[in-house]
């Protein structure tokens, strides 16, 4: 049958799947049917799954199939088996079509036991002008021998979807490209999903690769209402899973979990629409790969992995670096992954004159090293599922590892040292207090947080009272550092917005915190009582850690420096800052300046009296964007600057260097260029600057 030519040449292919089970029995041929054949080199192939979006059958020994016509059928499509690909894996369902012919071609990359694929999510582009990053995707796919590329939705708008279709398809990428329907992909038309389906085909489908069955599900709701219901999708999923051999690994793709609570640790089942699926009865469920939250996240529950990736071209809403993730599935469907931040290029790592350097197994994101009594403590991230999350203690003089203890998930942000204990929090809210001598756990705190609301913020502490503050913006908890007992909990009434990677400001009896798309909150540090909250267009986009001093809050949000009255939350002064300030920095007050990092203007100093820009501290081009929604090129300092004993300003930077500037005029004095981006603050102790980078290197620079 005829189809629009540009769709025929540019449509994404499905690549795929499984060792075919025995073909189904010959379907009844009375009445009206969707009929057709599946061929390989003009020869019939048996056992291929064919569906109309509800009913599923397999081709017979002659490669033929027949599905009873039904009202509401949109497409006739196939589940492309392992070892094959198909340029036209679907056709619009029509009673006028006499025969649907699907032609498979061999695809060795998906023919083995297990496979690799590149996962993308939330690229949110506006047109062809924003496709330059896709070359990096192809490079990663080629290097990792990916069987396919999957984009789990929020391609964004008609122009964005069309640009993806033209620039990222099976021809340009050299392998099948799979697209999922996200909430921002539902655009104006007869139904929210109409445009997506005209460009990419069925919003729900399956395919196979490496002996694994992959199931694609759509977003339940979006910017425009879809015509389908998730109950319809659930009925098809049940029929689809009934076609595969028992024990065959199954991995789901979707823009988000099919049900809000699906990524809990309970693996007895999940829900699509109003219909429950019991893992042990319906399939060998080994993974759900999704997007939507703009975060890097890997959680394993038994044999099942839940994987979320940050956008590939910009920082996530919670300051996750732009990410290209390769997922590897073994023959049993077990998923592991490798992350590259923002680019396919290999970083050129250099020691840069460091007194010592030690590489840790995991990456270091926003976890600032803590130096105490001759020991450097660093927390590591594991968004790849490799088991590298933990806390490591190193000898400050030599860099030798003193002890290393695992955490259940990533230690993405700041730790604290209070009451003789090192205290860390992972992104699922678990808090652990380690004894500095040997890393033994003194106490634990394990909250039950909502599975979508992972914690990206750093821990804060009040050394005077011995309280440690965990949580972010809502459901904050104050814990006694000595005993681990909870002193107070926020009531959790404000469950809005998204997490951000700041650290709460503590001082003068108050604790000030923020949430993206929500606002700023001030609690009584002793009781947890909410003193005030402010939600406005500026404070809805935080990122930086607030500084409390002399009854004022010095805050940075969106594009502004804010001076706020601590008692009332009212803004006293505001200054628009060139380059944007939605980064994980904090204001450094000096005698004449307020100094802080920016997204695009390096380090900026404001005159304390006038708030005029006094100087800008230059840095190189950033290596990986992480500030929310920010894209390259940029000159980003996303860390907290500090004053050296000689009065110079020091900060680590996204350009892969630790920089030093003259405080009076911002003149660049020197740098240690090591090659990997710095998201964590550098610190000074006993004549050395200590810094930890995104490649997991910890270094000591003698200054």
What are the language-model segments listed below?
Residues 5-25:
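N-terminal export signals
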Residues 29-41, 93-95, 118-121, 239-243, ...:
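Metal-dependent phosphoesterase/phosphodiesterase active-site architecture
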Residues 29-35, 40-41, 52-54, 70-163:
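N-terminal active-site segment of His-dependent metallophosphoesterases
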Residues 80-96, 161-249, 271-285, 295-334:
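Extended active-site neighborhood of metal-dependent phosphoesterases/phosphodiesterases
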Residues 346-365, 390, 400-406, 440-451, ...:
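Aromatic (tryptophan-biased) beta-strands that constitute blades/sheets of beta-rich domains
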Residues 363-391, 408-431, 451-476, 490, ...:
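Repeat-blade elements of multi-bladed beta-propeller folds
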């Amino acid at each position: 049958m005829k189809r629009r030519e540009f769709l025929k040449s540019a449509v994404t292919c499905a690549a795929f799947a499984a060792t075919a089970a025995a073909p189904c029995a010959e379907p009844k041929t009375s009445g009206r049917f969707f009929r057709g054949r599946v061929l390989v080199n003009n020869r019939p192939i048996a056992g291929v799954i064919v569906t109309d979006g509800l009913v599923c059958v397999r081709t017979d020994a002659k490669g033929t199939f027949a599905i009873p016509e039904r009202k509401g059928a949109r497409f006739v499509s196939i589940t492309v088996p392992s070892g094959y690909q198909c340029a036209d894996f679907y056709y619009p369902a029509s009673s006028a079509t006499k025969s649907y012919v699907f032609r498979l071609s061999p695809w060795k990359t998906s023919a083995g036991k297990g496979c690799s694929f590149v996962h993308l999510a939330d690229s949110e582009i506006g047109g062809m002008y924003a496709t330059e990053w896709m070359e990096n995707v192809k490079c990663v796919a080629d290097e990792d021998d990916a069987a396919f590329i999957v984009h789990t939705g929020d391609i964004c708008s008609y122009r964005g979807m069309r640009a993806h279709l033209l620039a990222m398809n099976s021809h340009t990428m050299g392998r099948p490209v799979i697209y999922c329907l996200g909430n921002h992909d539902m655009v104006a038309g007869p139904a929210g999903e109409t445009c997506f389906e005209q460009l990419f085909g069925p919003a729900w489908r399956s395919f196979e690769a490496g002996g694994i069955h992959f199931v694609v599900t759509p977003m339940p709701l979006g910017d425009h209402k879809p015509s389908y219901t998730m109950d319809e999708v659930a009925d098809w999923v049940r029929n689809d899973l009934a076609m595969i051999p028992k024990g065959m690994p199954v991995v789901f793709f979707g823009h988000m979990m099919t049900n809000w609570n699906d990524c809990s640790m309970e693996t007895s089942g999940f829900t699509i629409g109003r219909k429950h699926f019991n893992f042990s009865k319906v399939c060998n469920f080994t993974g759900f790969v999704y997007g939507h939250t703009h975060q890097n996240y890997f959680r394993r529950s038994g044999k099942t992995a839940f994987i979320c990736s940050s956008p590939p071209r910009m920082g996530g809403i919670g300051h996750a670096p732009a990410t290209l993730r390769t997922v590897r599935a073994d023959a049993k469907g077990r998923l592991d992954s490798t992350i590259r931040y923002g680019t396919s290029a290999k970083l050129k790592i250099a020691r840069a004159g460091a007194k010592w350097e030690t590489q840790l197994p995991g990456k270091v994101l926003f976890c600032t090293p803590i130096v105490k009594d001759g020991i450097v403590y660093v927390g590591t991230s594991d968004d790849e599922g490799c088991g590298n999350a933990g806390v490591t203690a190193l000898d400050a003089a030599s860099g030798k590892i003193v002890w290393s203890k695992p955490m259940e998930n990533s230690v993405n942000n700041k730790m604290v040292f209070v009451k003789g204990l090192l205290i860390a929090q992972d992104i699922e809210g678990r808090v652990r207090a380690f004894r500095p001598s040997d890393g033994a756990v003194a106490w634990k705190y394990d909250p039950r947080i909502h599975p979508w609301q992972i914690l990206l913020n750093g821990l804060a502490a009040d050394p005077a009272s011995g309280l440690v503050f965990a949580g972010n913006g809502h459901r904050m908890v104050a814990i006694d550092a000595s005993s681990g007992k909870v002193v107070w909990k926020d009531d959790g009434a404000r469950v809005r917005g998204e997490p951000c990677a700041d650290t709460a400001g503590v001082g003068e009896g108050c604790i000030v915190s923020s949430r993206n798309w929500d606002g700023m909150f001030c609690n009584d540090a002793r009781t947890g009582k909410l003193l005030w909250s402010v939600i406005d267009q500026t404070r809805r986009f935080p990122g930086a850690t607030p500084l409390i001093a002399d009854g004022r809050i010095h805050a940075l949000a969106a594009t502004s420096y804010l001076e706020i009255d601590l008692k009332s939350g009212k803004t006293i002064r505001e200054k628009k800052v060139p380059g944007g300030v939605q980064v994980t920095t904090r204001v450094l007050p000096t005698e004449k300046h307020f100094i802080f990092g920016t997204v695009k203007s390096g380090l900026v100093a404001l005159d304390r009296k006038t708030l005029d820009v006094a100087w800008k501290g230059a840095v190189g081009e950033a290596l990986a964007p992480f500030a929310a929604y920010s894209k390259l090129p940029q000159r980003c300092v996303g860390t907290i600057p500090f004053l050296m004993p000689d009065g110079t300003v020091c900060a680590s930077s996204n350009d892969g260097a630790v920089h030093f500037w003259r405080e009076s005029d911002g003149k660049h004095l020197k740098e240690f260029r090591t090659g990997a981006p710095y998201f964590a603050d550098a610190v000074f102790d006993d004549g050395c600057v200590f810094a930890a980078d995104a490649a997991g290197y910890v270094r000591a620079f003698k200054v």
